[in-house]
Regions:
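Aromatic/hydrophobic pocket-lining residues that form the small-molecule binding cavity
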Residues: 15, 19, 112
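A short acidic, helix-capping loop that chelates divalent metal ions and anchors anionic groups
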Residues: 6-9, 111, 160
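Catalytic alpha/beta core domains of metabolic enzymes, predominantly
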Residues: 23-29, 36-141
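Short, intrinsically disordered, charge-balanced linker/junction segments flanking boundaries
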Residues: 168-170
């Protein structure tokens, strides 16, 4: 899972060069692109992903879409698409996505797996609403601070965070 470089303003050509460089230096790599404009300052377009996959089909194998501009419309054979939120899991599966990649799955893995399995087994969806409700609670806070705060109830090591992060006070 590789995000484009942060802090610099650049366009598709520079993003293409960045990922091309990685693939050329590590040709055995299998890369899931990380589309998260809020953190990197860059938003992947369908065009640049299609070009990367065309030129590097064995290395560019998927995208985690936390910007949510791709997961509903990007269709590339043998290419994995993962929305970045539990609230997008069921809809994503319905339109051909592979699953989700989400930090909150550290907490919601069992529920997310049940939604995933029920979808593939064509069972009635009885856990999706609960899965989305749990995610929405975390969305009310700084996601990573909330995750550390929750997980620190079971394991002290999650209380160790570096500034600017802190545990929740509520």
């Amino acid at each position: 899972l590789i995000m484009p470089p942060a802090y610099y303003k650049y366009g598709d050509e520079e993003a293409y060069a960045f990922f091309s460089n990685i693939v050329q230096r590590v040709p055995e790599s299998e890369i899931v692109l990380y589309n998260f404009e809020k953190l990197s300052g860059y938003k992947f377009s369908k065009k640049i992903i299609e070009k990367l996959v065309k030129d590097y089909p064995k290395q560019i194998v998927g995208v985690k879409d936390s910007t949510y501009n791709l997961y509903e419309t990007l269709k590339i054979p043998n290419f994995m698409i993962f929305p970045g939120s539990e609230t997008k899991l069921l809809k994503g599966l319905e339109i051909g996505c592979s699953g989700i990649i989400s930090a909150i799955c550290n907490v919601t893995a069992a529920l997310a797996r049940k939604v995933y399995d029920d979808f593939h087994n064509k069972n009635k969806q009885t856990f999706n609403e609960k899965l989305c409700a749990v995610r929405e609670v975390f969305d009310n806070y700084n996601l990573i601070s909330g995750l550390h705060s929750f997980m620190s109830e079971e394991n002290e090591k999650y209380k160790r965070v570096l500034p600017p992060l802190s545990l929740l006070s509520e």
